[in-house]
Amino acid sequence: MLTLGCAYYPEDWDETMIEKDAEQMRSVGMKLVRIGEFAWSHMEKSDGIFSFEWLHKVFQIFQKNDLDIILGTPTAAAPPWLVRKHPEILYVDFFGQRAYPGVRQYTCCTSPVYRRYAARIVERMVSEFHSYSNLFAWQIDNELEINQVNCCCPACKSGFREYLKRKYKTLEAVNQAWKTTFWSSEYSDWEEIEIGDMDRNLNPSLVLESQRYRNLVYLAYIENQASIIRKGCPGLPIVTNNCGDPVDRHALFQRLSAAGGDLYVNPAHRLPTIAFWMDLLRGFRPGTLPWLLECSTTPWEPVKNLLELLMVHYHARGADFQLYFHWRSHSGGFEKSHGSFVGFCGTERPGLASFRKAAKKLLPVLKEFGDLPPPECRAGILYDFDAQYNYSQGFRSRSAEYGSKLRAFHEHLFAGGINSDLVPPDADFRKYALLLIPAHPHVSQKFADRLKNYVQEGGVVLLGAESGLFDDESNYISTSGPGHLQDLFGLEIRDYIRFRKSDFPNGCITFSGHFGGKTVRSECDCWIASIHPLDAEVLCTFDSGLYQGQPACTLHRFGKGVALYCGAAASDLKFERELIHYAASLAGLPLL
């Protein structure tokens, strides 16, 4: 059932203002309020000197107004006294520059000192507020790793080296796994190994392993706080919001009660883009509806009833809980100009009227339906934490392209009226008639076996370009590609060419063919494969270039199912859509 609310910062206001705001929140249809996530310095004004009286009063005021609370742990913004006492908790960027205090997320969650202080404030908050009946849920931290750089502080370097020792045992094993003979990079001492960062022309193996280590750090950081909350508030939901790419969000949200995220609509966001982010969020914890912990109070497009449209769209894609950021504008500080429902001088802003109207219209109607199930999806899109780093690092690095491929494949399904889940490699594929794999550089034997079983039993899979050519260390496999999947796709990939479309001012390499009798054609972009069919059917061939006349797209029947392969990164979105819709038709999925 749809539950609406907002983010609120009572540390900014006096009791009279809080009373007024609480009454108005309830009157417009709100039930939930998120507080506390940036209030550490107001809760602990100096080391060990806690001040919670004001927050108790907030709980009581909200309780009187029948408002439930999501209480945020305030660890996204450390107080100045803590930084002054322990400057070593500040993160350090790739070039050795320490963060400047005064912003948020300028601390390193690897730091044992910072974790100790974070645990202490969370323990005190649990002790103070666990008994309130209107304590509805906890939010841990805020937007972990959204703004922060990849930290390279001494604690991170030391932790990374210990992680490598546990994984590889010896330096010889590291050198062999990472192929460090290239660029004279062989290690003779553990202290020589520096933690990596994205897009710095570093060894891709180092970058991949660095991101795996950082992910474990973030998971442990969240778990440290979650364990404290579970002990003191058993049964209460625990969430967090919008973690960045360095966190394996499938793994993270399995440890929490639901997947939580933020979504701010701007003019660049069309409906398919919004649908993608909602489906991605829902897929992080299958079977549990996601929580939208921040969304726009004032959608940027000046379109009548847009907020109502978005509210319905969010709900239709699974968001039972929708909290809007934020209620009342800050009178000062960095985000004083951020969108809100109530302006700096107390006047209602246009978004509040839109919200009131939408809530009044929708809440009674949706209440009749009760709890809605998640959208039924017959198609899955593979999203893998490792793949985004294995795919993008190295010569002609393309960090943003993995996410772009996911969004494009999702949008093509969306355009055909097909709902899809974004799923990790260990998901149960059998619930899907169609599985799209935009890019999956490393194919393990275990994953290959599961994929073969899926197709053998009747599934349809489409594998995109640049898949199945790397090992688990981001090195090339020693056989033809796609790794462990030649029999499934009925082909071998023996070579490839990587290029830029801009390198061909007079027209790029093209390929063409037929999908179910329909003629298709596209220019290539970035990458083409040298495909040698074993027993695959050729759907498209290259029209020009070194691979002229060779296959570009193939189809292979395997057991009861079908395996499609596209050995070219297509620059034409129309072609890509035709390919995906053809795959959907083979899977028996109706198209709009």
Show the residue positions of the predicted features.
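The substrate-binding groove and active-site-proximal loops of carbohydrate-active enzymes
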Residues: T3-E15, G36-W54, A99-A119, L144-V149, ...
